[in-house]
Amino acid sequence: MAGAKEIKTKIASVQSTQKITKAMEMVATSKMRKTQDRMAASRPYSETIRNVISHVSKASIGYKHPFLVEREVKKIGILVISTDRGMCGGLNVNLFKTTLNQIKNWKEQNISTDLGLIGSKGISFFRSFGFNIKGQLSGLGDTPALEELIGVANTMFDAYRNGEIDAVYIAYNKFVNTMSQKPVVQQLVPLPESKDDHLNERQQTWDYLYEPEPKVLLDSLLVRYLESQIYQAVVDNVASEQAARMVAMKAATDNAGNLINDLRLVYNKARQASITNELNEIVAGAAAI
């Protein structure tokens, strides 16, 4: 059994680690709440643009924006959003597994894939698989700006316009709640039809007067909508990261507490054994006299 002094040193070391994990848990909780506020603020903007696009696209007779046109799919571009830092449980691993499974399914249909990567964890992971990476970005921090994301996103959209790829998807961790984050792979381009599109079509029997003309408006709105979808996905992923880190650090703090209790028991037993040995030596010495 280790000596009492050695055990006491271990207890102090674990207590120091526990303070760090507790602080990280509190920081992650604060950041998660701020990110949730950004999520709530950006969703109405995205939903409103989606509804306007639906209406304008129906009014723009004779014109179909390339982002609305379905075509035979031979190659798909995936924008994968991961984290820059670790210590967030299996968040990235689950996302990578989901993405690789989807790529495998497409491969079985003779569909190849190109990647655009946001986040250093995804960059280091997918590089090892030898994928064709069309663009990458890292170091966004906890408050990503749309201007920073446009470069990688436009690389994928330009490839779609030029016919290099036939669809663009986005893979990220969707924030469900504090305890649940769901990895998803969803289609961006061609823009999938929303359930609300049919509802709006039934409800609205009137039309707008468009200024400028519907074509110009539609071109602009589609770009804004896709940018908002990417921003929303990145913010969702940041919220998921902070929630996963908060849970992981809480588990680490609790485990440290349990370990400290176990070490204290061992320390008390070692101290008791030491005292017993000293008493036995005293008794033996007295008996010898």
Swiss-Prot record:
It is a peripheral membrane protein. Its main location: membrane. One of its GO terms (cellular component) is proton-transporting ATP synthase complex. Keywords: ATP synthesis, Cell inner membrane, Cell membrane, CF(1), Hydrogen ion transport, Ion transport, Membrane, Transport. It is found in: Cell inner membrane. GO terms for molecular function: ATP binding; proton-transporting ATP synthase activity, rotational mechanism. PROSITE patterns: ATPASE_GAMMA. One of its GO terms (biological process) is proton motive force-driven plasma membrane ATP synthesis. Belongs to the ATPase gamma chain family. HAMAP family: ATP_synth_gamma_bact. Produces ATP from ADP in the presence of a proton gradient across the membrane. The gamma chain is believed to be important in regulating ATPase activity and the flow of protons through the CF(0) complex. NCBIfam families: ATPsyn_F1gamma, PRK05621.1-1. F-type ATPases have 2 components, CF(1) - the catalytic core - and CF(0) - the membrane proton channel. CF(1) has five subunits: alpha(3), beta(3), gamma(1), delta(1), epsilon(1). CF(0) has three main subunits: a, b and c. This is ATP synthase gamma chain. The gene is atpG.
